[in-house]
Amino acid sequence: MLNLDKPLYTIGITAEILATHTRTLMMYEHLGLVVPSRTATNRRLYSQRDIITLGAIQRLTRGYGLNLVSARYLILCLQLLDAHGIPRPAGLTEIDVEHVKV
């Protein structure tokens, strides 16, 4: 079974996976959208859950034109709808937020 919270990926690898810049990841960290683990030498290590979370945020900001605060809020709303078995609004059914942590 895959441990989604195990820190595995450096900031460079994470940026490459997400097709973004390391500075963008640092900004997301500064805003509290994701908090990577740190090594003994203070290097950032991202988990698979961090990458899933960042990918969901990117889909909402790039694909739907939301700002970062709105993307975070929408993820929380979708998680609440899913947790209570309430159908999602049309157009938001394909966004997977099951393993996202915001």
PLM regions with names:
Residues L2-E16, M26, H30, V35-P36, ...:
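Arg/Lys-rich, alpha-helical DNA-contact motif
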Residues H21-R23:
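Short coil turns linking two alpha-helices in DNA-binding domains
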